[in-house]
Amino acid sequence: MLFNINEKGEPLVISFAPFLSPEAIKHLQENERCRDQSQKRTAQQIEAIYTSGQNILVSASAGSGKTFVMVERILDKILRGVSIDRLFISTFTVKAATELRERIENKLYSQIAQTTDFQMKVYLTEQLQSLCQADIGTMDAFAQKVVSRYGYSIGISSQFRIMQDKAEQDVLKQEVFSKLFNEFMNQKEAPVFRALVKNFSGNCKDTSAFRELVYTCYSFSQSTENPKIWLQENFLSAAKTYQRLEDIPDHDIELLLLAMQDTANQLRDVTDMEDYGQLTKAGSRSAKYTKHLTIIEKLSDWVRDFKCLYGKAGLDRLIRDVTGLIPSGNDVTVSKVKYPVFKTLHQKLKQFRHLETILMYQKDCFSLLEQLQDFVLAFSEAYLAVKIQESAFEFSDIAHFAIKILEENTDIRQSYQQHYHEVMVDEYQDNNHMQERLLTLLSNGHNRFMVGDIKQSIYRFRQADPQIFNQKFRDYQKKPEQGKVILLKENFRSQSEVLNVSNAVFSHLMDESVGDVLYDEQHQLIAGSHAQTVPYLDRRAQLLLYNSDKDDGNAPSDSEGISFSEVTIVAKEIIKLHNDKGVPFEDITLLVSSRTRNDIISHTFNQYGIPIATDGGQQNYLKSVEVMVMLDTLRTINNPRNDYALVALLRSPMFAFDEDDLARIALQKDNELDKDCLYDKIQRAVIGRGAHPELIHDTLLGKLNVFLKTLKSWRRYAKLGSLYDLIWKIFNDRFYFDFVASQAKAEQAQANLYALALRANQFEKSGYKGLYRFIKMIDKVLETQNDLADVEVATPKQAVNLMTIHKSKGLQFPYVFILNCDKRFSMTDIHKSFILNRQHGIGIKYLADIKGLLGETTLNSVKVSMETLPYQLNKQELRLATLSEEMRLLYVAMTRAEKKVYFIGKASKSKSQEITDPKKLGKLLPLALREQLLTFQDWLLAIADIFSTEDLYFDVRFIEDSDLTQESVGRLQTPQLLNPDDLKDNRQSETIARALDMLEAVSQLNANYEAAIHLPTVRTPSQLKATYEPLLEPIGVDIIEKSSRSLSDFTLPHFSKKAKVEASHIGSALHQLMQVLPLSKPINQQTLLDALRGIDSNEEVKTALDLKKIESFFCDTSLGQFFQTYQKHLYREAPFAILKLDPISQEEYVLRGIIDAYFLFDDHIVLVDYKTDKYKQPIELKKRYQQQLELYAEALTQTYKLPVTKRYLVLMGGGKPEIVEV
């Protein structure tokens, strides 16, 4: 029950419906099932929306409508009297929070429009107003709010800032590390500390490897709920626990025995094959068969009788026996086909080999680990102290402060627990332990609502732990009194072709060992509607593999990259889809594992005329080719004797020297000089005094003269002109800006070059002058392995999308191509010199001196790197965790598709059959096999081979070179939009340079004189708008767009034609109509025509007004309905006047204008402005009018002393009315 006050000051009582009982929920489920609608809520969705009074874990499979469930549940809570500000709603990203808030807002608007009860309308309106202050956001954002409010309780100032710049963090870390390192090198235990540093860095002078170890340990500890306690209690956990053979975990012994038994079974399967050859021609057992039978029998016996024959104490003896029993190779060959029978067992033996020796030396490294523990603890405390002094923190610091506040202050914790009706979290599978602790502190123990899908947990690199979700899942299933598990299995996104192949693949791949969850019936995808089950034979999934048997070297030298042939396969399929089936490009998406090494995709697509839009990629502005060329040009101007920069400039398109030219120049060495730089050789070559002047032919001599003349002019200009002007001079002199316009990614390249000039200009304006300082600044950024922000260009809307699998999460696309399926999973972390684990702590490779063990007397030491037992345990867990993450990545990628999924890879057709024999295997691929296969492609081929008798819902097809000829691939059926010859006289760089020179001069003149001379006493927002709109966007995109526009048309006017109605007249007429339109009546065509007669405009203007669009605004948009619902609060065409201070002249002036519409409520104002401008994207007008609406808001706030909480643009210049919140 809720009390409000009416206009007379009388209390209004709102009675809310109670929460549904389990019986009422069942009744609702039955009613929904009987409804005659194609799209119904599932029983599980209804249960997730309406169940209350207990902890709830919703396991929502891909495309099951989890966001719909969350929004509906929130709305149901509000309708039952729970205010939106009493819900804690955590999202994984800021973008997700914004989208969720918008969905709730739209739902509230819709509910207000449907509600006839006045009291309920008032209540829902209040919820709408409270929405912007509600706790809907990331855990980081909430933690900041807690620390800002209660930081004083733990001695933290509320006036802190977030250190988001990695470069700033690195500088502070380096300062702390260096100081601490010197202290430890001079302490009492310095010899042990030196041994520690040498164990990782080789010597005490190069500390980079040791520094990386410390930083990694620190970062890892920050993801735990209490870093200090973890470092003190868990960091050396495994080192203290696993010191004897008896300490080895039973699970690891079981895995070894399982590998032995699997090897015996696989070997038996191979020996039973028809072509194996068990008998000789004489009819007796062959020697090979006898040997293999012995291996099978002994392995089986040792597994069965392990405890009595060996036990843990005899594990080292077992390892020696098995090593001596099996052959050193991995394969058994039958009929020229190799079966890797012993591969997995060899890997296991390697893990346990020399255990006694390792354990003997492992004791020696414990003192090193204690020193490391002390150093990391000291580093953590010192680094935090520096950040406290600077009042600048990282996100993890803020989260730990929030945890500390809630743990140490019972009253604060209880106030939050009492305030929040429910603690809701989205993407729960991606939480880490720090976030889980914070959620636990906010909850009262029985009011948590968690939504996620462990099969989509793909953020382990951010220390996300899917086992948090998994443990809750198991606990709630075993003990229902702790919480309820609800499974959302129905998929409403994909056709059956996608669902079937996903189920087929993961039912053979995913279980608790690899994937962290058994992909059984409760996790399989089910079509949510009948329409999804309609079969389409041409949408069957395909694994398309380029046959590399005759690979001509088209693949990049880097095996991680995708080959030209693979991309050509994709281009061929896209052309077929577009030409034959009319599939628009924007319906097609390419998914890749990483943002790097994808240039070949853009280049190949450009050749075939396929438009492509990328997701931006990682920050690599300084690594883009055109920027690197310009930076080397500037380095050469600064110091021509920098050979690396000089060679790069000579080889660049500006001068186009080839390898032969450079070789001839290199031979002009002066034999009397020991060190001779390339610049000196060029000068000698020009005057004919080199060691081999006969090699410098006339053409080369001419190129050298041009180069030296140009370089001389640049170096002279660099001393006199600005860096900004120098860059534009380079563009003009060598046509480089124009050259990149003819290359792939022309817009991006030109924007990058333009941004370089602007950044140089900003650098000099900040007080740093000179080319040398600019180069040093850039080099410093590169040295810290950082980069400058990438320049964004407007991506084409009608284009194929290219993005990473991580970026695609939560999205859906009709056609999905999963590229580079032959790329090996990154196993870099499991080969490092140390591995961290939350339970076990740290495991290291120890550099042991085994001189005594070998009895060596001549050498000072014999160093051997040993994998300690903790390291081996952590390594095995990390390997399985990595494979599990990759498996979940494949799941995410496949379930993005709505209609069809393609797998693209490369393999040798002749070698692709080398998989284990399909006999005697269960539903899953053997664990040993899943562990040894390290690509998506290997998994799919293994499934296709071993389970070939099943319908796996995907086909494997090898593509030959003959399938990828120009004729076979085909061409897009699109007209040529632009004749390149039309641009032959268009020198963009000159035009831009002249424009920028003019703008610079005008800007300087304005800054010096115009403020004082031309300041008017009265201004309008439209006049001020021009001062806020940049003449040229910083990234240069607008210039590029304008340069491609056609020249002005000077066609003579046709006087017989009627004059065109001015856009400004249409805008004025619209404003008049919106002012006089009676909102108390239903808005339809007749109402609009009646109102139109009363405005002061000629008939041509009235006829030009699109009344259907205006009607659509009021009838089809929530804002239009808001106009009608709250017409008593509405003010239209309201004039205003306020005093403003000119920022330059410091003179006051009057700002006058007219506000189209605003709603005045008791505690806030909503502002609305109509625009009839033509536009391509709404964001254009949002940027254009943002400052104008801020002026309107300022005027309203000054007048009413109330905040303007919402500002809307009503865009009438498109095909339909669009509402944009500013």
UniProtKB/Swiss-Prot annotation:
Q: Which is an annotated GO molecular function term of this record? A: double-stranded DNA binding
Q: Gene3D superfamilies, alphabetically? A: 3.90.320.10, P-loop containing nucleotide triphosphate hydrolases, PCRA, domain 4
- So which cofactors does this thing need? Mg(2+)
Q: Can you state which reaction this protein catalyses?
A: Couples ATP hydrolysis with the unwinding of duplex DNA by translocating in the 3'-5' direction; ATP + H2O = ADP + phosphate + H(+)
Report the SUPFAM superfamilies cross-referenced here. Answer: P-loop containing nucleoside triphosphate hydrolases, Restriction endonuclease-like
UniProt GO BP: double-strand break repair via homologous recombination
Query: From what superkingdom does this record's organism come?
Result: Bacteria
- Claim: ATP-binding is one of the keywords in the record: yes
Q: Which UniProt keywords apply?
A: ATP-binding, DNA damage, DNA repair, DNA-binding, Exonuclease, Helicase, Hydrolase, Isomerase, Nuclease, Nucleotide-binding
Which residues does the annotation say bind ATP? 48-55
Would you name any one GO CC term? Answer: DNA helicase complex
Q: Residues in domain UvrD-like helicase ATP-binding?
A: 27-483
Q: What is its EC number?
A: 3.1.-.-, 5.6.2.4
Which Pfam families does the record associate with it? Answer: PDDEXK_1, UvrD-helicase, UvrD_C
Domain named UvrD-like helicase C-terminal: residues: 512-798
Instruction: Cite the InterPro entries for this sequence.
Output: AddA (IPR014152), DNA_helicase_UvrD-like_C (IPR014017), DNA_helicase_UvrD/REP (IPR000212), P-loop_NTPase (IPR027417), PDDEXK-like_dom_sf (IPR011604), PDDEXK_AddAB-type (IPR038726), Restrct_endonuc-II-like (IPR011335), UvrD-like_ATP-bd (IPR014016)
- HAMAP family per the record? AddA
Known PANTHER family for this protein? Answer: ATP-DEPENDENT HELICASE_NUCLEASE SUBUNIT A, UVRD / RECB / PCRA DNA HELICASE FAMILY MEMBER
**Quaternary structure annotation from Swiss-Prot or TrEMBL:** Heterodimer of AddA and AddB/RexB.
- What does the sequence similarity comment in the record state about its family? Belongs to the helicase family. AddA subfamily.
Q: What does this protein do?
A: The heterodimer acts as both an ATP-dependent DNA helicase and an ATP-dependent, dual-direction single-stranded exonuclease. Recognizes the chi site generating a DNA molecule suitable for the initiation of homologous recombination. The AddA nuclease domain is required for chi fragment generation; this subunit has the helicase and 3' -> 5' nuclease activities.
- Protein name (database record): ATP-dependent helicase/nuclease subunit A
